[in-house]
Amino acid sequence: MRTAGHSQEEVRLGGTLVSRWIALSLLLVASASGAEPGPIRLYDLTYTLDIDAARPDQVQMAWDHCHAVAALQGLVNRHEPVLYIRFAHSRYRNRNIDHFWLEKLSEPGGWLHGRPIRRIETLADLIAQFRSHIRGLVVYDPNVAATSNVASTVAGVEDLLPVRYDRSEGSLYRLLVEGERSLPVRRWLVGPDGASLFTGAGRIPGTDLPSTGSAKCDAYLWMKHNYLDAGRCDGAYGAYYLDQYWLKKPRNAALNHHCLTNHDFFVARKAFFFDLGVWADETPVDDPDQELGTDLETLKALLLSAYHHGGKENMIHIGGFVPWAHKYTTHGDAGGRHDPVPTEWEYGRVISAYNGFMDADAISYGAMANASFFMHFPMRPEYTQKWVTRQELAERGYLDADGQVRFDGREFLIFYVGDYDCAAWLYQRTMDIWDDPARGQVPMMWCISPVLDRRAPMAMDYMRRTATPNDYFASADNGAGYCEPGMLQEPRGVSGLPCGLDAWARHCKTFYDRWGLSVTGFIIYAHGPELNEAGLDCYASFSGNGIVPSGGPASLLHKGMPVLRFDHDVNEGDPADAARHVVQRIAQRRTEGHPPFHWFRNILKTPTWYVRTYDAIQQINPKIELLDAPTFFELYRIHLESQGPSSP
């Protein structure tokens, strides 16, 4: 079943032969039985990227193999880290991302140092190796695209492998259903003869529920009835990933952006999977004959059930993102009437109304493998950070004898170093952004959502262990997950549910305390309302040293928490252009009456870019001073205290 193969001796990780790793021994805490963990099983899935995307048979092979392997990995790694996949390749370094992380984790003193690695050569051998983890198969319908996501849900709950119905020669279906190593089919989402079960007519199969008129939505409501409503899924985990519609347009984004390899973590967590539009005023490109708004109403039904089965108490962690290059937007041939960014915002508004938040694996760097392996990484109980004292500020010349801010004509600047609101972007870009040799030369406020430690704990730990004194960490949008917090406030639009602020505060405080965070570097209001008094109180309970919302008052001190409204995005590639933008905007802000504290957002910029941009800023206006986050926000708080009454 493999289209490519290499001997063990031919596979290298950063110049280290895999055969050399086999001589290493593991430095992990022994299990309760005292036994050492077994070897890591390594499977190379990169052959699925080395295909001709114009050939349907090769595209189907890539989809089928990635889907089955990801689900298998989620099952195998549910309780311990055993199966590791080699898949994604860096666009900025000539390295495989998964090998990068395996190398890092295998360094002396590392989590995996000395643990033997055994390569598995073929998909058939991989399945045979882990046959004891698999109860059988769930077969889904190539003519009802939504059934591929339903199959991922079923796979996680019932310990099954998802297989697309395809009786053509050489298909995965032929191997696993009709071949010598066949497995029992435990769940059919299509007739054994290939006829569709979900037709958009009559009643939803196996239920008394009337059809929605959409086979797509009927499949999801069948899933809801049998898995979410029945409490068999964990409602605290959802997964918004592109369904098998990808097979029609594999080149609309990076070839790895089917994001099937992202499924493993959510399969392990028994999450519910979906791919639905969020607009009530248009029909989706993948289901144009449905009644207007059916996708949205189906999504709301899923979210409400999830809310009642874990989300109410724990929030709903939803991996993935709007598949804007393929569906639901104006981009290319995605067939929608709304632009991608408003569609993102509307999606955020809807899920937040049910206590949902995004772990937003967005296009460009959305593919991620091995999260079900990484989730077992042994984090420290806490990662502390020091906040600056007023005595230290005075000693550094920032405060006068009366304890007031000494501006001396200076303009204080801070950059929001983002966007790290999803595990996939952090996993992909650490090697070229964090490991940039210029890091440490200027202060940088790294804004990373702390909830990413569920899927990429090794990256967050690596950053903390290798941080310089100029690296400080704050939370990304909008806290411990990308949630529109105004939609947690009563009255709640869309859902009409009770206030969700207490659940959000408990959720965020757990992660902020673990990672030593006290600043939320950006809060996106988007299509939701601004924070009201209760919402500000919520953030003050876990982010007391500052927030930067996208709306509301330009400056505010709320119960001691400094609030600074966001300003421009500065994302010019040329540092000279970026510097001119910053300098001009600071001058404009001052004429508009803003205080000499300035925040600008940047997306996936390297430390080298920041060094060169700040050098160029200094050449234009040496009075502009880039500060570290504690200094910036503490000075801003002191300044606000001097301005008179604050929010009580």
Identify the meaning behind each predicted range:
Residues A371-R464:
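Active-site beta->alpha N-cap acidic-glycine motif
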Residues S19-A30:
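Bacterial N-terminal signal peptides
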Residues M1-V18:
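N-terminal secretory signal peptides that target proteins for export/translocation
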Residues V29-P37:
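Bacterial Sec-dependent signal peptides at the C-terminal "C-region" and cleavage site
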Residues E36-P381:
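Preference for solvent-exposed, low-hydrophobicity sequence contexts
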Residues S449-T510, R514-L517:
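Substrate-binding cleft of extracellular glycoside hydrolase catalytic domains
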Residues T46-A68, L83-I97, K104, W111-L112, ...:
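Acidic-and-aromatic substrate-binding clefts and catalytic sites of carbohydrate-active enzymes
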Residues L292-P323, L413, V417-Q441, V451, ...:
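Catalytic grooves of carbohydrate-active enzymes
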